Amino acid sequence: MGERRKTRQAEVNIGMVGHVDHGKTTLTKALTGVWTDTHSEELRRGITIKIGFADAEIRRCPNCGRYSTSPVCPYCGHETEFVRRVSFIDAPGHEALMTTMLAGASLMDGAILVIAANEPCPRPQTREHLMALQIIGQKNIIIAQNKIELVDKEKALENYRQIKEFIKGTVAENAPIIPISALHGANIDVLVKAIEDFIPTPKRDPNKPPKMLVLRSFDVNKPGTPPEKLVGGVLGGSIVQGKLKVGDEIEIRPGIPYEEHGRIRYEPITTEIVSLQAGGQFVEEAYPGGLVGVGTKLDPYLTKGDLMAGNVVGKPGKLPPVWDSLRLEVHLLERVVGTEQELRVEPIKRKEVLLLNVGTARTMGLVTNLGKDEIEVKLQIPVCAEPGDRVAISRQIGSRWRLIGYGIIKE
């Protein structure tokens, strides 16, 4: 067992989504043993700001047949058998962090929508996160009705009916609703079995050219490190197709900004992979699933503080095109999501500035042209994306960016 565990990488990414304080991080801890809020400001404010990843092994007990994430069955004490390793993406539920949640959503193969039983459903971010899943086309959804320890049976049933009503007509209409207490670990086995039943590992072709979406980037050198001990910049993200190997030459697009004739342009860069980390282990090869850390020969100055977030990594010459402007086939929602009162979505106007999320990248787009169900936008920061990719569209309403629909990239 120990040997297999060493080389094991998560094979599926599952998003934890839902309203702030409904228990996403607590549930991630119940499933993985890892508290994903490790950013100092997060611990102080008690909310998730950056996206957290934590892996768990799904295991089944051959004796009683129940599922858990522990090597010894918590129900009968028998040794459990490994089924697969999954990675949980803990996405921020706070409204100001919605664009971060969208970046994480682009890496999800399925999602657990956490809804607290002790509050009326839906709350603004519950609605907003479900809309985000709808926009990225995510259908593999489980609903965890959390905090049932705080309500009586009547209240829990009333909340269940509200959830049923809320998901009617959405991608989550047929999602199982599982009552749990993340705090006390109650019914977690039922939730783990639902993950097995409703969130399959996607079929992937390892021979496709590799493509990794960058979510974070770091300078891992401590201040005062002597020059000969400095290591190159590290990129953190998720491989969405193909595989990466230590020693591979990689290209990063759109790359790094430089100034030319008073305009900011971007230049793709190439470098070499010197190390790979997956599931907390150094590995020689990394595949889709989980968060992968890619050690490079890049100057760490380029990667510090998430500067490379939103880039795409692949083999030189094999990456999708970089776009300075996009033509989008637009699908607007009827109502703005995330606001306390429901507002109608007004049509997009020429010269309007929109916030666009493409994969893990986010950029501003100035609307230069309008057609029937189509817009053209000039991008502030170029993006690397395929024709046919989905783009989440947000508009500034009051002081916040609000999700108003999505676009599909046209040639």
UniProtKB/Swiss-Prot annotation:
Region (G2): 46-50
Top-level division of the source organism's lineage: Archaea
Chain positions recorded as Zn(2+) binding sites: 61, 64, 73, 76
Listed GO MF terms: GTP binding; GTPase activity; metal ion binding; translation elongation factor activity; translation initiation factor activity; tRNA binding
Gene Ontology annotations for the cellular component aspect, listed alphabetically: cytosol
One Pfam family hit: GTP_EFTU_D2
Region feature (G4): 146-149
UniProt: GTP binding residues: 21-26, 146-149, 181-183
Start and end residues of each stretch annotated as G3: 90-93
Keyword terms, alphabetized: GTP-binding, Hydrolase, Initiation factor, Magnesium, Metal-binding, Nucleotide-binding, Protein biosynthesis, Zinc
GO-annotated biological processes: formation of translation preinitiation complex
Positions of Mg(2+) 2 binding: 21, 46
Cofactor needs: Mg(2+)
Coiled-coil ranges (or none): none
Xref: CDD domains: eIF2_gamma (cd01888), eIF2_gamma_II (cd03688), eIF2_gamma_III (cd15490)
Region called G1, residue ranges: 18-25
Protein family according to the UniProt entry: Belongs to the TRAFAC class translation factor GTPase superfamily. Classic translation factor GTPase family. EIF2G subfamily.
Oligomeric and partner information: Heterotrimer composed of an alpha, a beta and a gamma chain.
PANTHER family cross-referenced by the UniProt entry: EUKARYOTIC TRANSLATION INITIATION FACTOR 2 SUBUNIT 3 FAMILY MEMBER (PTHR42854), EUKARYOTIC TRANSLATION INITIATION FACTOR 2 SUBUNIT 3-RELATED (PTHR42854:SF3)
HAMAP family: eIF_2_gamma
Protein name: Translation initiation factor 2 subunit gamma
